[in-house]
A protein has these predicted regions:
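Conserved N-lobe loop of protein kinases adjacent to the ATP-binding glycine-rich P-loop
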Residues: 33-42
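Activation-segment/catalytic-loop signature of the eukaryotic protein kinase fold
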Residues: 86
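Protein kinase catalytic-loop region centered on the HRD/HxD motif
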Residues: 132-145
């Protein structure tokens, strides 16, 4: 199991770790301050490559990460988080994205169920439309980008009502 970054740790002289905000099979996600752009919060996705991989496969995995990061950094759509940087430290790769405030759809569904309420049809249709727009945009890229992990926990709803499709860990380009 990889060692978690410590709160206050600074990566690349630019990103100060605040706390861990997510964890999955591919790695961890941290909330960080961008020290170069005062007041900007970002999400750092950390991917640690399997140490047991032969050197040639480890190199291929890193090259694939860098290719995908380059493609994701070129994306510009209101329903996708903006990728602003990527870098490697040791066997760990990092993808820097805009931090998306708000709750994920799974959390909203659980909260509504606990209260015995339903999500509003108008809101759900708006969210579905925004997700569709993001997917159409991704699929129209050259080469097409396939998210491959659409689920409520990967759909963030910002306080302003904007939907962001997050977690490109299983993306296929």
């Amino acid at each position: 199991m990889p060692v978690a970054l410590k709160n206050g740790e600074i990566l690349r002289g630019r990103y100060r770790i605040n706390r861990i905000i997510g964890q999955g099979g591919m790695g961890s996600i941290y909330l960080a301050d961008d020290l170069r752009l005062e007041g900007r919060l970002c999400a750092l996705k950390e991917v640690e490559h399997d140490r047991s991989l032969p050197a040639d496969l480890a190199k291929q995995a890193r090259e694939q990460f860098l290719r995908e990061a380059t493609v994701l950094a070129r994306l510009d759509h209101p329903n996708l988080p903006k990728v602003s940087d990527f870098f490697s430290i040791g066997i760990r790769d990092y993808l820097v994205m805009d931090f998306v405030p708000g709750k994920d759809l799974r959390t909203l569904m659980v909260e509504a169920r606990r209260k015995g309420e339903y999500l509003s049809e108008r809101e759900v249709l708006s969210w579905a439309s925004q997700i569709s727009d993001a997917l159409i945009y991704l699929h129209s890229q050259t080469p097409p980008i396939l998210h491959r992990d659409i689920k409520p926990s990967n759909i963030k709803l910002t306080p302003s009502g904007l939907v962001k499709l997050v977690d490109f860990g299983l993306v296929k380009i």
